[in-house]
A protein has these predicted regions:
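Activation segment
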Residues: 54-59
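Conserved catalytic-loop aspartate of Hanks-type protein kinases
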Residues: 62
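Protein kinase catalytic-loop region centered on the HRD/HxD motif
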Residues: 1-4
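Conserved HRD-motif arginine in the catalytic loop of eukaryotic-like protein kinases
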Residues: 140
């Protein structure tokens, strides 16, 4: 819906329809976008820094939260600083610009990428997630449409790599 800020995007609020479409649920704390929205509401682990600080925020706060969901999914269901017990301490570490959560440094240690396609897809997804999760709202995607465009490019590149792999496997069998 246009001009609606969900304010609590997290994995528990994302459902999959019978046809395989992702749907955002639980609009209990959503509200129409009003200039200078400042209410602190949502889940700390997926909350944008400006929301946590009680500063004015807009739709880019939801983009940040979606970026955190993508990070969580790509990082084997772990958030930045998951070893820290307190969600408030975790958000403070993210906001302080601690580079330890820069997942590009962790790509090789995840053990997820077992082939070139996976390595490449992680690198492509990295830029999208880090843009969505920028601490500065002006450095983030300014619309869901812009983020969707980059995610579609990412998917296209991953599918292209998969097709090349399939062609390579077929050629090796000949």
């Amino acid at each position: 819906a246009k001009n609606i800020i969900h304010r609590d995007i997290k994995p528990a609020n994302i459902m999959v329809s019978p046809k395989g479409y992702f749907k955002l649920g639980d609009f209990g704390v959503a509200r129409q976008q009003i200039s200078g929205t400042m209410t602190v509401i949502g889940s700390y682990d997926f909350m944008a820094p400006e929301v946590y600080k009680g500063m004015p925020y807009d739709q880019t706060a939801d983009i940040y939260s979606l970026g955190m969901v993508l990070y969580y999914l790509a990082n084997d269901f772990k958030l930045p600083f998951s070893e820290i017990q307190s969600s408030i301490d975790r958000i403070n570490r993210r906001m302080n610009g601690d580079t330890e959560w820069d997942w590009k440094q962790k790509l090789s240690s995840w053990g997820i990428a077992t082939n070139i396609k996976q390595k490449m897809s992680e690198e492509i997804l990295y830029d999208t997630v880090m843009t969505a999760c920028a601490n500065d709202p002006k450095a983030r995607y300014q619309s869901a449409t812009a983020m969707k465009r980059d995610l579609m490019i990412c998917m296209d590149k991953i599918c292209t790599l998969e097709k090349r792999k399939d062609n390579w496997e077929a050629a090796k069998k000949k």
